[in-house]
Swiss-Prot record:
Belongs to the universal ribosomal protein uS2 family. Gene3D superfamilies: Glucose-6-phosphate isomerase like protein, domain 1, Helix hairpin bin. It comes from the Bacteria. Residues 236-257 are annotated as: Disordered. The gene is rpsB. This is Small ribosomal subunit protein uS2. One of its GO terms (molecular function) is structural constituent of ribosome. Keywords: Ribonucleoprotein, Ribosomal protein. GO terms for cellular component: cytosolic small ribosomal subunit. One of its GO terms (biological process) is translation.
């Protein structure tokens, strides 16, 4: 299991919250105190809640669920993309389209459109079109890729969602809650923790803090996926052994007859 240390959290600045005048009182249980007008997050609680979130993500992936990484603010975009790709999951790091989950059937049509245009460029079909029309296809492709590129391979709704800054991703969380999709999130002192199933109290603005916690969640996905693959392989080998044993019994019975 991937662990997280107080040293790592301190070095990444995970303990720095928002200004005391910009806070959500519901975050009081996760706050250690204030320093120079800034709330300091209780990192002992961050470690504790991180472990719960990590285990939940790992077990969910072990059971076959997929994870959607969401973080559209500038500080989160690179980490969300890189860590989701590293663990083989989907992501949204640009604009969240309203209905991306609740109206996934329609969004899927746009994804299929992107795939068709991609195929035209890959197999050379695009060359049969006039230059002006080909340019329009390219513009559409770039636009769709920017918004939908991270979920291009998502054929069904995710089993859970990992979010950076729930205050910024309010619509995404509302859609997840409506569909009963659990949410794991980095929750800063200005956020409402109530809609979040697995709160990770922490700085959701500093790039280093975001990268650290995102990478740990990606590690949880990888660990869960490895355990799932091992279990499936063992099941497959067990079935093969049982089949071989059955054949041997039949052969022995035939020989005795």
């Amino acid at each position: 299991m991937s662990s997280i240390s107080m040293k790592e959290l301190l070095e990444a600045g995970v303990h720095f919250g928002h200004q005391t005048k910009r806070w959500n009182p519901k975050m009081k249980p996760y706050i250690f105190g204030a320093r120079n007008g800034i709330y300091i997050i209780d990192l002992q609680k961050t470690v504790r809640y991180f472990k719960s979130a990590y285990n939940f993500v790992k077990e969910s992936v072990l059971n076959g669920d997929t994870v959607l990484f969401v973080g559209t603010k500038k500080q989160a975009q690179d980490s969300v993309c890189e860590e989701a790709q590293r663990c083989g999951m989907h992501y949204v790091n640009q604009r969240w389209l309203g209905g991306m989950l609740t109206n996934f059937t329609t969004v899927k049509q746009s994804i299929d459109r992107l795939k068709r245009i991609d195929a035209m460029f890959e197999d050379g079909t695009i060359e049969a079109y006039p230059k002006k029309e080909a340019l329009q296809f390219e513009k559409e492709r770039v636009k769709l890729q920017k918004i939908l590129g991270g979920i291009k391979g998502m054929n069904r709704l995710p089993g859970l969602m990992f979010v950076i800054d729930p205050k910024n991703e309010e619509i995404a969380i509302q859609e997840a809650k409506k569909l009963g999709i659990p949410v794991v999130a980095i929750v800063d002192t200005n956020c409402d923790p109530d809609p979040i199933d697995y709160v990770i109290p922490g700085n959701d603005d500093a790039i280093r803090a975001i990268r650290l916690l995102s990478s740990k969640m990606a590690d949880a996905v990888i660990e869960g996926a490895q355990a799932r693959n091992a279990a499936l392989q063992a099941e497959k080998e067990g079935a093969a052994d049982a089949e071989t044993a059955g054949e041997q019994v039949v052969e022995e019975e035939v020989a005795q007859a």
